[in-house]
Amino acid sequence: MWTRVRDGKRDGLVEVWKQVEKIAEGAAMMANVDYKITLISGVHEVLVNETGAKAMQKNLEALGAISYTEEEQDYAKKIQEATGKPQVGIESIISPLEKTAEFPMGGSTDVGDVSYVVPVIRLRATTAPKGTPWHSWAVVACGGMSIGHKGMRHASKILAMTMVDLYKDPKLVSDI
């Protein structure tokens, strides 16, 4: 049997996993069979790296927001219309740095597992119109044209600027 368990926090995941182990043991006893548990991987929450996030936010603000052409805005609205979302176009803003939610919504990611081993800094870049469902044809369509390209180039610049800061500032590295 293959199973996957999820929880918003690592401690909660451990408790759920212990329950799964008990269920497997009980099921094996009822069926009078042997069983073996193999843990393949985990998907834990991402540990917040506030110092790294602040360093990256500084570069995001220094670079400024992405500007979009009228044609890109029109395309974004067509994507929103096709996916049943309000036709507001694509935002050209820089959001302020916010505290990470205690239990952030969204899917699981193995980035959380990585964050338990090495510091992780995450950046969200606009590559599709607001409200576009991720893992959909609409995001793929935007990624293959200037909206997605601008977002990735912008993100690349911000990441590079942050890496230069880390290279130049050993204290920043140790604080992260």
Q: Predicted segment positions?
A:
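Metal-dependent amide/peptide-bond hydrolase catalytic core
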Residues: 1-176
